[in-house]
């Protein structure tokens, strides 16, 4: 990829396939690092099949019992009134669309359900609850979702329907029988609960129940078919199936193909040009805020370029980045391209990339440095670099903390997205030392019983580990400023994170600040921040091409 005077080589590694299981806090942001397209971004014809989406599709008219449909829509009207919800015409249209897919007598591809891919912040949860209530089924409904959203869904269901769902999670799993689950109106569970572990290969009680409806919220968790989660989801028995995600394509076209498999659409359909058109037009509901006329306060994005304050800090980062050779420098002279420096990666490239990111925020340990020294990476003694790290005075952390403290009295709640536990701890301590004491950390260390309390309370600053709290949370009431300490490999994760604030109910302009380190040596050696941005843009190209027809 050409970017200014540099040409970057983006290495194609699908880390979800290499390491499909949970990864440590030290490297959890790496799981979505590449996941590039199957065919490679350099192929001239990589998007040929996507271009065909622009053509008109011929789809048979669905056969729907209009009397049954209107009866269901009357149920929806009662639901809105009884739940004391604000009527929104686009949500009614969405519920009507969902019910028509469930009750049609000739569903395309034999799919009774579909993919709800409305833009983040439009209220997909309420839409789905409305559909569940409006078209009651004899068998129970199973909702599969990230563990962080269990309580939010349970509260929303009880608030709007007066019925408490059964939460199949934790100790509750031991109390269940097939009969007890079958007698529930709605059951909530997690993606890990439906997973079929490869070593055991055994199904669990959830796979024995005949579900009337299965709903996968944040369905992009199913994008990797090599995982036990995907296998377990595919094994569930159901009449209707719904996928809910505002980001159905995160890294590559195969993300969308795998969601089609969950809908049980044959590969012979979704991998053909005409089939892709028909799928998009018949089983996918995708609407943006602009399309439905929803006007929210603006999102103002600011990139904060951070200069290196310490030569020793910069030297440490340069040593590690030099070992990666992340760039191909190209120099043009007399219209002739000269030698392109070839990038060479060591066998532990993924760990090295993680270390390069950590070097920008001072999170390297003595063990990390000793390993790097053994590999011949460091130009100075470990002791000298440890002195730098122990000072906890790194340029990027300073920039983030100073920016937040400068705005501490402006009346806007602040969300700071981090990658590492230690990073969150340092930022919180520095903010407290600077007089901002009403701060809290939301990450995997926080007990589930405490998470609801943290989210309901208003804090001056909420520090969130991005993989823990980037999706599903409603934070628009208390927060309108977002700080990304570093870019994430997956741009959809950042989009989801911004949508925690920029959604229905937000009354303030949402300011987003992205912190990026300056390059290391006369702009010849890019930092990981710059490199991640290149990877992000390649992934956004895929998403834009797939959504072009929308």
Q: Whereabouts are the PLM-identified features?
A:
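SF2 helicase motor core recognition
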Residues: 197, 251-252, 424-426, 451, ...
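Conserved helicase ATPase motor motifs in RecA-like P-loop NTPase domains
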Residues: 120, 239-252
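Conserved Walker A/P-loop ATP-binding site and its immediately adjacent core
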Residues: 138-159, 420
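Conserved pre-motif I regulatory segment
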Residues: 68-115
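A conserved SF2-helicase RecA2
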Residues: 489-498, 502-550
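Inter-lobe coupling linker of SF2 helicases/translocases
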Residues: 188-189, 193, 203-208, 228-238, ...
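Conserved Helicase C-terminal RecA-like lobe
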Residues: 68, 109-113, 119, 127, ...
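Walker A/P-loop NTP-binding motif
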Residues: 99-103, 125-139
């Amino acid at each position: 990829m050409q970017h200014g005077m540099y040409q970057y080589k983006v290495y194609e590694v699908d880390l979800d396939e290499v390491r499909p299981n949970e990864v440590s806090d030290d490297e959890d942001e790496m799981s979505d690092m590449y996941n590039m397209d199957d065919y490679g971004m350099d192929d001239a014809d990589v998007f040929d099949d996507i271009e065909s989406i622009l053509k008109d599709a011929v789809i048979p008219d669905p056969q729907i019992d209009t009397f049954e449909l209107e009866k269901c829509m009357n149920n929806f009207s009662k639901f809105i009134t009884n739940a004391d919800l604000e009527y929104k015409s686009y949500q009614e249209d969405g519920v009507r669309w969902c019910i028509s897919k469930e009750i049609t007598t000739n569903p395309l591809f034999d799919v009774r359900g579909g993919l709800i891919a409305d833009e983040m912040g439009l209220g997909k949860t309420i839409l789905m609850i409305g559909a569940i209530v409006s078209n009651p089924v004899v068998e129970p409904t199973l909702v599969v979702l990230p563990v962080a959203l269990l309580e939010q869904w349970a509260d929303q269901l009880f608030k709007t329907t007066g019925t408490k769902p059964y939460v199949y999670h934790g100790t509750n799993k031991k109390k269940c029988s097939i009969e007890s689950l079958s007698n529930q109106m709605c059951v909530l569970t997690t993606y890990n609960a439906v997973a079929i572990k490869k070593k055991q290969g055994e199904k669990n009680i959830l796979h024995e129940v005949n579900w009337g409806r299965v709903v996968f919220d944040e369905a992009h968790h199913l994008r990797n078919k090599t995982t036990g989660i995907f296998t377990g989801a595919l094994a569930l028995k159901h009449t209707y199936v719904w996928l809910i995600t505002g980001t159905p394509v995160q890294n590559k076209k195969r993300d969308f193909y795998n969601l089609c498999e969950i809908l049980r659409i044959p590969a012979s359909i979704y991998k053909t040009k005409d089939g892709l058109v028909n799928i998009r037009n018949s089983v996918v509901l995708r609407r943006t805020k602009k399309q439905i006329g929803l006007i929210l306060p603006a999102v103002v994005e600011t990139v904060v370029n951070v200069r290196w304050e310490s030569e020793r800090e910069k030297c440490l980062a340069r040593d590690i980045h030099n070992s990666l050779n992340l760039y191909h420098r190209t120099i043009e002279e007399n219209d002739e391209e000269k030698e392109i420096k070839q990038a060479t990666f060591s066998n532990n490239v993924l760990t090295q990339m993680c270390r390069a990111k950590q070097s920008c925020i001072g999170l390297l340990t003595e063990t990390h440095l000793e390993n790097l020294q053994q590999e011949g990476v460091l130009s100075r003694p470990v002791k000298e670099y440890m002195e730098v790290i122990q000072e906890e005075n790194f340029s990027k952390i300073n920039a983030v903390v100073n920016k937040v403290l400068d705005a501490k009295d402006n009346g806007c709640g602040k969300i700071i997205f981090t990658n590492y536990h230690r990073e969150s701890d340092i930022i919180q301590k520095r903010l407290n030392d600077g007089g901002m004491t009403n701060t809290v950390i939301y990450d995997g260390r926080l007990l589930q019983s405490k998470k609801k309390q943290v989210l309901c309370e208003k804090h001056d600053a909420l520090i969130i580990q991005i993989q823990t709290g980037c999706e599903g949370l409603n934070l628009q009431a208390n927060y309108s400023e977002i700080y990304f300490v570093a870019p994430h490999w997956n741009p959809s994760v950042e989009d989801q994170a911004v949508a925690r604030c920029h959604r229905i109910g937000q009354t303030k302009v949402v300011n987003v600040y992205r912190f990026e380190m300056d390059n290391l040596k006369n702009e010849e050696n890019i930092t990981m921040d710059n490199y991640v941005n290149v990877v992000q843009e390649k992934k956004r190209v895929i998403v834009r091409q797939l959504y072009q027809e929308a």
